[in-house]
A protein has these predicted regions:
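Short loop/turn motifs at secondary-structure junctions and domain boundaries
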Residues: 39-44
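Conserved acyl-donor/pantetheine-binding loop and adjacent beta-alpha core of acyl/acetyltransferases
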Residues: 61-93, 100
């Protein structure tokens, strides 16, 4: 569990490390592509976050406004966010196993 960490906005340069966290947390059938993460950074830059322990990315959050209908399909890019969003959709929140239990996910949310 990290002793100290910071949370900041996700940047395109973070995607490679985000993919490593994703692979450490989820089964192969749920993994999403670098293009998906780049897309979410483009359409919702203020609500895509990462947690860092020093220089190491230990967790991330992808969230954005959405309508209450069906969630977006797995690993599909979005052209834009819905204009009449009525829900805050947490697409993904993941923390490396070694960093779990220290409040990282709560800080991201």
């Amino acid at each position: 569990v990290p002793q100290s960490y910071i949370v900041r906005t996700m940047r395109p340069a973070d995607v490679e490390a985000v993919l490593r966290v994703q692979a450490a947390v989820y089964p192969a059938s749920l993994l999403e592509s670098a293009a998906l993460f780049q897309n979410r950074i483009e359409i919702a830059p203020a609500t895509c976050q990462v947690a860092l322990d020093g220089q190491d990315l230990i967790g991330y959050l992808i969230a954005y406004p959405w309508d209450a209908g069906l969630p977006p399909a797995l690993d599909r890019s979005l052209e834009r966010l819905p204009g009449a969003a009525d829900t805050w959709f947490v697409h993904d929140c993941a923390v490396l196993p070694a960093a779990q239990g220290g409040g990282v996910a709560a800080a991201l949310l």
